[in-house]
């Protein structure tokens, strides 16, 4: 099935190994996105190193160059929850930011936060939220296992 042609203002999710990179489509094949120093076209797994930097550059590049060999899709997943800002405002703000160096934090100011703020006026990252949930569930599970282990150990000692 062919990938639907993105429209200006659409959020583009690019499937990198181990995470998704996000951009906003601005027309004529171009996207605007946050590019930490290692986020080069087709970077793949190497771009996970972007987690180690606190700065990013807002870049306007061809979608095909940013995606490289990775698959991508239009993903305006929050349209039911938030009303997108007017298209001219989305594009104008995105274009004004091109070339600027901005703060980059994996957990609070990443590429997904960036594009959601442009489209909806709300910076949010489901990848970060989901990772926190997994870490919390894992931590609670490990704590429960530890508690069970201590209780079984005490019970065994009491029987001896």
Curated annotation (Swiss-Prot):
GO terms for biological process: ether lipid metabolic process; lens fiber cell differentiation; lipid catabolic process; membrane disassembly; N-acylphosphatidylethanolamine metabolic process; negative regulation of cell cycle; organelle disassembly; peroxisome organization. It is found in: Cell membrane; Cytoplasm; Cytoplasm, Cytosol; Cytoplasm, Perinuclear region. The keyword rRNA-binding does not apply. Pfam families: LRAT (PF04970). It catalyses: a 1,2-diacyl-sn-glycero-3-phosphocholine + H2O = a 1-acyl-sn-glycero-3-phosphocholine + a fatty acid + H(+); a 1,2-diacyl-sn-glycero-3-phosphocholine + H2O = a 2-acyl-sn-glycero-3-phosphocholine + a fatty acid + H(+); 1,2-dihexadecanoyl-sn-glycero-3-phosphocholine + H2O = 1-hexadecanoyl-sn-glycero-3-phosphocholine + hexadecanoate + H(+); 1,2-dihexadecanoyl-sn-glycero-3-phosphocholine + H2O = 2-hexadecanoyl-sn-glycero-3-phosphocholine + hexadecanoate + H(+). InterPro entries: H-rev107_PLA/AT, LRAT_dom. Induction: Induced during preadipocyte differentiation into adipocytes. The active site is at residues 21, 33, 111. Keywords: Cell membrane, Cytoplasm, Endoplasmic reticulum, Hydrolase, Lipid degradation, Lipid metabolism, Lysosome, Membrane, Mitochondrion, Nucleus, Peroxisome, Transferase, Transmembrane, Transmembrane helix. Its main location: membrane. The chain crosses the membrane at residues 132-152. Interacts with PPP2R1A; this interaction might decrease PP2A activity. Belongs to the H-rev107 family. The C-terminal transmembrane domain is required for the targeting of the protein to damaged organelles. This is Phospholipase A and acyltransferase 3.
């Amino acid at each position: 099935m062919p990938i639907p042609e993105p429209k200006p203002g659409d959020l583009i999710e690019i499937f990198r190994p181990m995470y998704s990179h996000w951009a906003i489509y601005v027309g004529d094949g171009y996207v605007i996105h946050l590019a930490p120093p290692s986020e080069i076209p087709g970077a793949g797994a190497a771009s996970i190193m972007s987690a180690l930097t606190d700065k990013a550059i807002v870049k306007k590049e061809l979608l095909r160059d940013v995606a490289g060999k990775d698959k991508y899709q239009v993903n305006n997943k929050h349209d039911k929850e938030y009303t997108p800002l007017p298209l001219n405002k989305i594009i104008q703000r995105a274009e004004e930011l091109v070339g600027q160096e901005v703060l980059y934090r994996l957990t609070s100011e990443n590429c997904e936060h960036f594009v959601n703020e442009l489209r909806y006026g709300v910076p949010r990252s489901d990848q970060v939220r989901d990772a926190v949930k997994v870490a919390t569930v894992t931590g609670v599970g490990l704590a429960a296992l530890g508690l069970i282990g201590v209780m079984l150990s005490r019970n065994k000692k009491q029987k001896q």
